[in-house]
Amino acid sequence: MKAGIVGLPNVGKSTLFNCLTNSKAQSANFPFCTIEPNVGVVNIPDTRLNRIVELIEPEKVVPNTVDIVDIAGLVKGASKGEGLGNQFLSNIRETNAIIHVLRCYQNENITHVEGSVDPLRDKEIVDFELQLKDLESLEKRKEKIIKHLKIGGNEYKKEFVFVEQLIEHLKKGLSLRNFNIDSESYEKYLKPLSLLTLKPVLYVCNIDEKLINNNDQ
């Protein structure tokens, strides 16, 4: 299992990575502090494993783990190669899940690439870039399917209809994880494409420390 930490530059991705993995990756007040992805490993607590260890007392215990990847920040136009866009999207493609960090605090001393703090806008920027990249991948696949259909590849008709539906879904500004996809279609058509917006997402809100114990905000 591999989870990638993503978000705009300078929102706290490397800080979260260090907290989760007990690492010391560079974290600084400027965009693209992270260029090459940092990778750390986190053990997964499992009470069932603890119980088994108590019963059989093995010589060695190997817990389940998750690889955490601190990925370079994304900016508008990443799907077209802006910033570190191509590298960013390639790194996400290699993960199984996304941890999306959103900056939710004000601090004049910490720059924001968009000039202001707006977590909903920031979320939409990342979502939009991932959707555009998936749209590009599906359009390329559609072109290949059409070539097969032109030479009598009737077995591609079902895939063509399916891909068309996904393209229309993305054009509405929706991610593919919100599209009802059966396991057979996923395994047959989508798994080889490793589409970005199919990956499950956990949103992490980076808030002001003063608000941590404030239940009213």
Region spans (language model):
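Conserved G1/Walker A P-loop phosphate-binding module
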Residues: 1-111, 127, 139-141, 145
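C-terminal-of-GTPase-core extension/linker across diverse P-loop GTPases
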Residues: 2-6, 11, 17, 139, ...
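Short amphipathic alpha-helical patches
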Residues: 39-44, 75-76, 115, 122, ...
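Poly-acidic low-complexity segments
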Residues: 43-46, 102-103, 107-121, 153-156, ...
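Alpha-helix initiation/capping motif
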Residues: 45-46, 85, 118, 182, ...
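Flexible beta-alpha connector loops of hexameric P-loop NTPases
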Residues: 74-79, 115-129, 149-154, 210-212
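Acidic/glycine-rich phosphate/pyrophosphate-binding loops and surrounding catalytic core
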Residues: 136
